[in-house]
Amino acid sequence: NAVENIAISCELIRSHVLHLSTDFVFDGTAGPYKENDQPNPLHFYAESKLKSEEIIKKNLTNWSIARTIIIYGITDNMSRSNIVLWAKGEIGKGNTINVVKDQYRSPTLAEDLAKGCISIIDKSAYGLYHLSGPKTYSILDLVYQVADFYNLDKSLINPVFSASLK
């Protein structure tokens, strides 16, 4: 287990480890969530992130965990996508996209996440933190904002319920 090996090695040198996690450790039925709310992961990715958090807590003295939500921003060479770039790209190509209208998230600008992580390390702030953007949007509203910002055709956005994507 990579996380366990890293945690054990870092504990040997008393390193402060900052582990990035996700809001997916929650089931999404009662947000926004606080750090002490009970996780309830619904799929493998979420379960693996929660297990990693538990490994960090068990094996380290100096640990911080930062749970974040929908990281977005411009990437070098567009080498990695995010919801903003995906929506811009697909609508920009004239493709119709299905976007959930019943999920709400607080998207996080990558630069803001980096500043939050630096602050945690600089202040030796140990424990569990939720780092996200200041506003909560439906995924649909977020994608509509992307379309508005880039002056794209919003008629290509097809609102759907999450259950229809399963």
Model-derived regions: residue spans:
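Active-site YXXXK catalytic motif of short-chain dehydrogenase/reductase
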Residues: Y45, K49, R67
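NAD(P)-dependent short-chain dehydrogenase/reductase
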Residues: E54-R105, E111-D112, S119
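Mid/C-terminal beta-alpha module of Rossmann-like enzyme folds, strongest
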Residues: G116, K123-K166
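NAD(P)-cofactor binding segment of oxidoreductase domains
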Residues: N1-L18, L50, I55
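Hydrophobic residues in well-ordered beta-strands that form the structural core
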Residues: L18-H19, I65
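Short acidic donor-binding/metal-coordinating loop in glycosyltransferase active sites
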Residues: T22, T68, G133
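Catalytic tyrosine of NAD(P)H-dependent dehydrogenase/reductases that use a Tyr as the general acid/base
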Residues: L42-Y45, D102
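Active-site "gating" loop of Rossmann-like NAD(P)-dependent oxidoreductase/epimerase domains
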Residues: L20-H43
